[in-house]
């Protein structure tokens, strides 16, 4: 009998501790936050590096595992009477052929199988401009989309779909959620007439406004796409109002202890900032590419102060089941993608790695810019005239090239991964002084991230002395003429005007190249960059491009 009573007692204790009834909220209110960021179209499984999973490799991640995990946590917490919130911190677009072909359509369809409660836009959501974003916003109608530091008054269709903040009305508490995207997003993508401002200032203003709208709100979460370093600044500047920051953009690994994956953590999960006001601000991020699902339960007191917390990111390895609804919904998309991408468009006899393109001349960049030149005329024109083209100079920023090419056949999917942004290849007149300024700007990054703007080129020969001060590093610069015979060079004349070719993103001032936006004249659109690349591959394969002295670096 004593054994039976003891067993019943333990059972009752188990029920009480695993079924958090509403009275628990009289002392502490638990809230579970599930979060993802920088998904980058990893609908399918990947290898541990986030690349397509090949035979023999360990396959992890994929949307089916992510959404299985989200659904499972929600159900488990409901049984305990713990409320939950599913947050997406942006950059769902771009990164695989699934997005290149399916764009907003596949992204919204599959995300809506278990839509986030709240989402902020990342910079890559703007990769195809306002026209590429609006259908996504219209289809994500079950998700609150928040961006407080964006002024959309000049883009009214966007303004209809995005708020600075939202108030999530749960059973036991109302929770304010404010969104911010990296302030420099116009330099990273095509944002149309949208304007952006400082993240912290926008958060403080939104916090005041949401409390006016609902004075009962004393828990505020920021969902950000600004990077971990900026998140820490936000915690410092807004910590009197903000309790939790759910971040993205920097693909940061936060984990307490040894993580289950191969990544090395940058800091604990969560990162804790003790604000002078007495608030404890928790900062979290869940790596990228569907490798992890963030899982944090926070316990708040009656005043909305963080008392304690528990949880860790969940690794999406093979132990995690895959959601059947997601797998079924992916089947027609996979068939379409396979049909479009398995066509052979060229061949390279050498590997063409992308990694070095951010700091030195690379063969991949030579191939890419040569294809841009070919879109406006080739050297074969010298057979019938005294000039071979109207635009003998081309350049592209390293950040435009998103994948390496490997020795062997080049599939359409390979070209698509290399050149996914569908910018126009444009020619325009540019003063020599501004051409030189663009090259100086490309060789003056302030940090590793800014190396994406390093220019690869065709029709230019430049020598940089990197020991000299920024914006004064060019020691020699020659430009190709359009006069036959092909490939003649002369010294740059800063007072002369040159006809150059670049992606439309650069010509529009993207990545900070404001001189191209402000001084370009007689702009001529030719074709999409991917089409220019494929046409060149078909014409000249097999290829064996190499570094050939277009860029010389002196240290």
UniProtKB/Swiss-Prot annotation:
Subcellular localization, as worded in the UniProt entry: Secreted
Activity under varying temperature: Optimum temperature is 40 degrees Celsius. Active from 20 to 47 degrees Celsius.
InterPro entries per the UniProt record, alphabetical: 5'-Nucleotdase_C (IPR008334), 5'-Nucleotdase_C_sf (IPR036907), 5'-Nucleotdase_CS (IPR006146), 5_nucleotidase/apyrase (IPR006179), Calcineurin-like_PHP_ApaH (IPR004843), Metallo-depent_PP-like (IPR029052)
EC numbers for this chain: 3.6.1.5
Gene3D superfamilies given in the database record: 3.60.21.10, 5'-Nucleotidase, C-terminal domain (3.90.780.10)
Domain of life: Eukaryota
Mechanisms controlling activity: DEPC (2 mM), sodium fluoride (10 mM) and 4,4'-Diisothiocyano-2,2'-stilbenedisulfonic acid (DIDS, 100 uM) nearly completely abrogate activity. Concanavalin A enhances activity.
Signal peptide from the UniProt entry: 1-25
Pfam families: 5_nucleotid_C, Metallophos
Activity dependence on pH, as recorded: Optimum pH is 8.0.
GO cellular component, one term: plasma membrane
Catalysed reactions listed for this entry: a ribonucleoside 5'-triphosphate + 2 H2O = a ribonucleoside 5'-phosphate + 2 phosphate + 2 H(+)
Positions with a binding annotation for a divalent metal cation 2: 38, 91, 123, 225, 249
Binding site for a divalent metal cation 1: 38, 40, 91
Protein keywords: Glycoprotein, Hemostasis impairing toxin, Hydrolase, Metal-binding, Nucleotide-binding, Platelet aggregation inhibiting toxin, Secreted, Signal, Toxin, Zinc
Site (Transition state stabilizer): 124, 127
Cysteines engaged in disulfide bonds, as pairs: none
Reported cofactor(s): Mg(2+); Mn(2+)
Record-level Gene Ontology MF annotations: 5'-nucleotidase activity; apyrase activity; integrin binding; magnesium ion binding; manganese ion binding; nucleotide binding; toxin activity
Disruption phenotype: RNAi-mediated knockdown results in reduced feeding capacities: smaller blood meals and longer times to complete blood feeding. Decreased ATPase and ADPase activities in saliva. Reduced ability of saliva to inhibit ADP-induced thrombocyte aggregation. Reduced ability of saliva to disaggregate ADP-triggered platelets.
Family statement: Belongs to the 5'-nucleotidase family.
Protein name: 5'-nucleotidase-related protein
Organism: Glossina morsitans morsitans (Savannah tsetse fly)
């Amino acid at each position: 009998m004593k054994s039976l009573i003891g067993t019943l007692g333990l059972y009752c204790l188990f029920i009480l501790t695993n079924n958090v009834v509403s009275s628990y909220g009289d002392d502490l209110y638990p809230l579970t936050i599930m979060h993802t960021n920088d998904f980058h179209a990893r609908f399918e499984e990947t290898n541990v590096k986030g690349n397509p999973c090949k035979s023999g490799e360990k396959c992890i991640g994929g949307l089916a595992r992510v959404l299985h995990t989200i659904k499972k946590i929600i159900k488990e917490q409901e049984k305990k009477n713990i409320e939950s919130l599913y947050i997406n911190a942006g950059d769902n677009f771009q990164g695989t052929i699934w997005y290149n072909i399916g764009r907003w359509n596949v992204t919204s369809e599959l995300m809506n199988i278990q839509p986030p409660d709240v989402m902020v836009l990342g910079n890559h959501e703007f990769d195809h401009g306002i026209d590429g974003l609006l259908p996504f916003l219209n289809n994500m109608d079950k998700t609150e989309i928040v961006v407080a530091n964006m002024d959309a008054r000049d883009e009214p269709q966007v303004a209809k779909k995005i708020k600075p903040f939202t108030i999530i009305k749960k059973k036991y508490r109302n929770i304010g959620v404010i969104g911010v995207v990296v302030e420099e997003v116009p330099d990273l993508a095509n944002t149309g007439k949208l304007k952006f401002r400082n993240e912290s200032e926008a958060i403080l203003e939104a916090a005041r406004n949401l409390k006016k709208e609902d004075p009962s709100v004393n828990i505020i979460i920021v969902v950000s796409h600004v990077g971990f370093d900026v998140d820490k600044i936000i915690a410092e500047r807004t910590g009197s109002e903000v309790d939790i920051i759910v971040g993205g953009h920097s693909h940061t690994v936060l984990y307490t202890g040894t993580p289950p994956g191969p990544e090395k953590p940058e800091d604990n999960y969560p990162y804790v900032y003790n604000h002078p006001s007495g608030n404890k601000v928790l900062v979290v991020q869940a790596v990228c590419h569907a490798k992890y699902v963030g899982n944090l339960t926070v316990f708040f007191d009656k005043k909305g102060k963080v008392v304690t917390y528990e949880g860790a990111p969940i690794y999406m390895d093979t132990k995690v089941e895959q959601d059947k609804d997601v797998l079924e919904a992916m089947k027609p998309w996979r068939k379409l993608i396979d049909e479009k991408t398995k066509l052979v468009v060229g061949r390279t006899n050498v590997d063409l790695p992308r990694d070095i393109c951010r700091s030195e001349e690379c063969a991949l960049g030579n191939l890419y810019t040569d294809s841009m030149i070919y879109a406006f005329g080739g050297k074969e024109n010298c057979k019938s005239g005294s000039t071979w083209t109207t635009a003998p100079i081309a350049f592209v920023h390293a950040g435009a090239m998103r994948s390496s090419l490997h020795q062997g056949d080049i599939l359409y999917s390979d070209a698509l991964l290399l050149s996914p942004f569908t910018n126009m290849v444009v020619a325009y007149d540019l003063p020599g002084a501004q051409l030189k300024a663009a090259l100086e700007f490309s060789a003056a990054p302030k940090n590793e991230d800014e190396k994406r703007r390093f220019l690869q080129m065709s029709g230019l020969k430049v020598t940089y002395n990197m020991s000299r001060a920024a914006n004064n590093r060019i020691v020699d610069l020659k430009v190709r003429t359009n006069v036959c015979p092909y490939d003649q060079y002369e010294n740059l004349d800063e007072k002369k005007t040159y006809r150059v070719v670049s992606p439309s993103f650069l010509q529009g001032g993207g990545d900070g190249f404001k001189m191209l936006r402000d001084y370009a004249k007689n702009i001529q659109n030719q074709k999409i960059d991917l089409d220019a690349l494929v046409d060149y591959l078909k014409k000249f394969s097999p290829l064996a491009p190499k570094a050939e002295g277009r860029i010389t670096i002196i240290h």
